[in-house]
Amino acid sequence: MNGGRRVLILGATSGIAQAVARVYAAAGARLALVARSREHLASVAADLTVRGGEVVLQRAADLCDLARHRTLIAEAHQALEGLDVVLVAHGLLPDQEACQEDPRKAVASWDVNFTSAATLMEAAAERMVVAEDGVLGVVSSVAGERGRADNYVYGSAKAALTAYASGLGQRLRGTGVTVVTIKPGPVDTPMMVGRKLNPRLVADVDVVGRRIHRALERGERVVYVPGKWRWIMAVIRALPIRIFERLRF
């Protein structure tokens, strides 16, 4: 089913993006990869080639440069000769206290985690609607379900991204383009190094990658990864505010 799939991954050097790309590569997909670091991107591309993928485009770019978004999408579309799957997977986990002390850091994190991701989705959707086909996935987070004291700067961006993806998906209904919102919990990636996390709640990145791949191929509208987070977050959302405010987790 996946052989020859034309896949664009934005933020291709992130841990989650690499895990998804490995699954597509093993199925013989053709890949276009975009990320900030040219050196890291080359390393990722080499690994995917060994695994069976055909990397037809590598592009080092600052994804916060909004003016480049349509050009990046157009280059990938041309190199791949179409777009079957687009995955928007870049992001960062900012230091909450640093963002509280310096609002410029908070704004910079929102630019990465929300603004650039949202505008990339629009640029990709614009191209995919013409073909009347395709899956547009975006990596949001369970952190966007309810703001918590230790990561509400990050969580607020992901909440906005989730809402944006929901609205975009509704707008694209009937066009042949499906929007998939991906909501991981904590995942064992470099972004989580140094964070104080309950190890029982941290998911293996390859398990997450396989689940995201399946969601993209099925066109699932919303996917929690791992699935237990759907029920965990349902409980957290339902907590009365006075109880929620007393908790620290």
Briefly describe each language-model feature range.
Residues V50-A67:
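Rossmann-fold cofactor-recognition segment
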Residues M121, A157:
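Active-site helix of classical SDR
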Residues T181, L197-I232:
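C-terminal helical subdomain
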Residues T13-S14:
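Conserved glycine-rich cofactor-binding loop
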Residues A27-V44:
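Conserved glycine-rich Rossmann-like NAD(P)H-binding loop of the short-chain dehydrogenase/reductase
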Residues S141:
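Residue(s) in the substrate-gating loop at a strand-loop-helix junction
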Residues R70, V85, G91-V107, D150:
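Conserved mid-core segment of classical short-chain dehydrogenase/reductases
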